[in-house]
Amino acid sequence: TPNKFSLYFSAPADSLPVLKGLNFDEKDAFVIEKTFRNDTIHYWIRDSLLYQQDTLTLSLNYLYTDTLNQLVPRTDTLRLAAKKVKKEEPKKKKKKDDEPEPTKFLSVNTHAPSSMDVFDYITMTFEEPVARFDSAAIHLRQKVDTIWTDVPFELEHDSLDVRRYNLYYDWEPGGEYEFAVDSTAFHGIYGLFTDKIKQAFKVRQIAEYG
C-alpha cells in the first residue's frame, strides 16, 4: 500500500535500524510494526502529505553481516517511490443514482470462537494501526439465568503486534457470554472506523479436557 513500506532482514537483530528522513522529518512520522526478532519491520506512514509524495528519501543505519560473518554498521540511502495505482472506471449503476455509497469500515478480524477455551481470550486484529478507541463502546456480557449482565474485563494493546488488542476475562466454565462493540468504537490512523461487532460464545466445561 502507498501508506506503508516494509524492510526484511535475513537475520534477527537486537534493535531496530536507525532511520533518518532526508527529504522529510522522520520524527513521529511512522507507526512501527515489527516481529519479535526485528527481522521484518513495517513502517505505517501517519501523514497523508508524506505518503502522497512521489518519492521519500531516507538513510538507514543497521548492522550488516560481512564476509567474515561479523556484524558491522552499515548505512544505505533508500529512495521509496510511490506506486501509481490506476484508477478504475466507475461502474455504471443499475440502481438509482441517488442511492448512497456503502460505508467503508475499518476491517477487523475478531477471535471469539463459539466454543471458547477456558484459558483463551478474545483478540481483535485491525487492517491498520488504531489511532484511538472508545472503551465505553466495548461490552462483555454474561448470561446469568436468563439475563445478560455486563461484566468487567481487561483490554490491552498487544505488546508484539501493533494492530492487535486483547480482551481478558476469568471465564466461568460452561458460561455463556456475548462480546459486542458499538459502531465507530475504533478509529484507524487513516480515518476509517469500525462497524458494530456482536459475537456470542460458550466456554468449555472442565470435564471436556479429560
Task: Tell what function each PLM region has.
Residues T1-G210:
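N-terminal targeting or signal-anchor segments and their processing/structural boundaries
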